[in-house]
Amino acid sequence: MDLFKSFGGKNNSKNIAKERLQLLLVHDRADVSPKFLEMIKEDILNVISNYVDIDEAGLNVEITKEKRSDNTYIPALHANIPIKKMKQVIR
C-alpha cells in the first residue's frame, strides 16, 4: 500500500520525492557530505509536512550501506520521522 495515496493530495510532490530517493539509491557509496544529507532532510520534510506535523527535534535521517544476500553492499536511506499529528486533507 502506498502510504501517501491514503492522504490524497499532491501527486507531483510525491513523484519528485520518489525520484530524489531513487537517485540516492543509484549512488554506490554511503559516505555523503553533511550538506548533501541536510538537503535530503529538507526535501523530505517539505513533502511530508504537507500531510503531517513533524517533531523535527526527533528527526533522524542517515544513509548507510547494507549487505545483501549476495554479499554485495547497497546504500540505504533510513529515516525516523516522529509525527505529532495528521493534517486534515481534502479528498
Curated annotation (Swiss-Prot):
Biological processes, Gene Ontology terms: cell division; regulation of division septum assembly
Hey, what's the signal peptide range on this chain? none
Lineage top rank: taxon: Bacteria
Q: Which InterPro entries match?
A: MinE, MinE_sf
Which keywords does UniProt give here?
Cell cycle, Cell division
Q: What does this protein do?
A: Prevents the cell division inhibition by proteins MinC and MinD at internal division sites while permitting inhibition at polar sites. This ensures cell division at the proper site by restricting the formation of a division septum at the midpoint of the long axis of the cell.
Family listed: Belongs to the MinE family.
Protein name, as recorded: Cell division topological specificity factor
Classification lineage: Bacteria, Bacillati, Bacillota, Clostridia, Thermoanaerobacterales
- Gene that produces this protein: minE
